[in-house]
Amino acid sequence: MTIIVDIIGREVLDSRGNPTVEVDVYLENGAFGRALVPSGASTGAHEAIELRDGDLRYQGKGVEKAVAAVNGEILEELGGRDARDQIAIDQAMIALDGTPNKARLGANALLGVSLAVAKAAADSLNLPLYRYIGGTQAHILPTPMMNIINGGVHADNLIDFQEFMIIPVGAPSVKEAIRYGAEIFHALKKRLKDAGYNTNVGDEGGFAPQFKSADQAIDFIMESIIACGYKPGEQIAIGLDCASTEFYKNGSYFYKGEGKCRNIAEQVDYLAQLVKSYPIVTIEDGMAEDDWEGWKLLTDTIGTKCQMVGDDLFVTNSARLRDGIKMGVGNSILIKVNQIGTLSETLDAVEVAHKAGYRAIISHRSGETEDSFIADLAVATNCGQIKTGSLARSDRLAKYNQLIRIEEMLGSQARYAGDIYR
């Protein structure tokens, strides 16, 4: 049957060469699930805690403590349970941890087990993962938000914003959307090289040129879109992840690249001007994670013109999301499985968002793996949007390739989300 008979955790490496947790789950009927846990560089203060060893190995970043929790306490607690009862399994691990932020056993330990259990249950029923999680109604292929220029803590340059994304809103399918993105990515590489900029890539596969402002980065992207024969705003839109918490201090936003300091009102005005000047349809973390006043002002100013996404603000946490909904802050939530630490809590956050009319965007982390779980999750939740990096690095492409496969599997039932921003 679908009874858990063994759980094996191990320490492996992520896309940055840092340790992460991998978990194998075996069921009584021979079914098997394996999951790898991602890790962020730009992390919100309110995220669940990933447990690191803090010793000399891997400069303190080892995860042997989290692995020991998987192979010890968690196995003892979950052995003999039914893998199909995801909520009960996740709740049992949360209770076992006993802390509000999963700090004792580690969110990385809990998440690895939670995702591997879901994969094993899907395998036992001979179902694709997206179908097992999402049921028969899972059929929407997400519009990809492709991060082709990296800045902030994701790159060694002076750009303060963390991500500049192209969004193929006018593509007829996810396969074609990925083609659009790849063509623009390579066109951008050529333009950067011709202009004398380095074309090395950052953590998420995007280029990391020594630009000093957001306008400069967007202008290069716009030129690359046009060079490929696509129409900005009609076929390709633009998205930003400001990651504003990273340059927010004492009530102001400090732009090292521009050498400017903006107060809350000036930050809002600056973002509003960018939306007016370019086909920007989504802005993530335009204000800092605890700048609720700024978030409210930003939402009131451009929330009807642009998707306002809370990442560090909401950290995939249903309670923080409910607070934001009550305050009228933001209109979308970024969903990162490791911010909360279990699959069932992740799905709950998506449900809370959808019930309130907020959009949800399934997202990777800067420290990724070859695990393509989030591609299936995006389809399972019918959320219509996914962030999984640029068109380089196999840890990013694993998700894009899985979306192509899922679209093929769904056949005539598949529907590409496309332009959901209007």
Swiss-Prot record:
Gene3D superfamilies: Enolase-like C-terminal domain, Enolase-like, N-terminal domain. This is Enolase. It comes from the Bacteria. It is an enzyme of class 4 (lyase). Pfam families: Enolase_C (PF00113), Enolase_N (PF03952). Keywords: Cytoplasm, Glycolysis, Lyase, Magnesium, Metal-binding, Secreted. (2R)-2-phosphoglycerate binds at residues 162, 336, 365-366, 387. Belongs to the enolase family. Its EC number is 4.2.1.11. Catalyzes the reversible conversion of 2-phosphoglycerate (2-PG) into phosphoenolpyruvate (PEP). It is essential for the degradation of carbohydrates via glycolysis. Mg(2+) binds at residues 241, 284, 311. GO terms for cellular component: cell surface; extracellular region; phosphopyruvate hydratase complex. The active site is at residues 204, 336. The keyword Magnesium applies. InterPro entries: Enolase (IPR000941), Enolase-like_C_sf (IPR036849), Enolase-like_N (IPR029017), Enolase_C (IPR020810), Enolase_CS (IPR020809), Enolase_N (IPR020811). GO terms for molecular function: magnesium ion binding; phosphopyruvate hydratase activity. Pathway: Carbohydrate degradation; glycolysis; pyruvate from D-glyceraldehyde 3-phosphate: step 4/5. It catalyses: (2R)-2-phosphoglycerate = phosphoenolpyruvate + H2O. Its main location: cytoplasm. Binds a second Mg(2+) ion via substrate during catalysis. GO terms for biological process: glycolytic process. Its cofactor is Mg(2+). It is found in: Cytoplasm; Secreted; Cell surface.
